[in-house]
Amino acid sequence: MILLLGLSLVSLGALSFDELIYKDEVKPSFDCSKIKDDGKSDDELMICNEIGVRNEFENKKLALADNIYSSLYQNISKKADKKIKKDFKAISKKMIKERKICIKNMQNTKAGENPILPLLNASDCMQEAYAKALLELMQRAKKDTKTKEVLEQIFKNKVDKYENLLTQSLNTNKDLQDFIDSLAKEDLIDSRAKFKF
């Protein structure tokens, strides 16, 4: 009886994907008011829901993915040496470059094409870029004792489970919803999708 009560109380603080996504506004890790509409930051404008407003649900998902990614990056970077930090930065630069390619591909819409399809494709493409980068960060962090320790603490010793969810997402062309939902339900992230570490 006491065990059941304890489990019930633990789950009270946990969220779900639905609770995260259906908030009025989901803010990414960066300040949207500072992003310029100059054609160079369209990936960030989409995450901020300034581009593709008809695609708000998917844009919110991108903001959640952005928060998870930046939170993981910041937490594991604190214990990383210069070489590993350099590797982490390279992973981030690659991910940002991939995000920008996703937006460029969206802008190549053909006349008569359903206008929502390019937005959905861009969102899927950007989620894939985040999934790849998250997986690469985790795999690189596991190769170093200090960052591996932090990674295990962040994921409460379930790193393999979350690597598998990311791999499944990439192998099945699914979005990050299951990954985010699992993080939320296991109380690893807060209401902004930042790790509670």
Language model: regions and residue ranges:
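N-terminal alpha-helical modules
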Residues: L15-F197
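Classical Sec-dependent N-terminal signal peptides that target proteins to the secretory pathway
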Residues: M1-S16
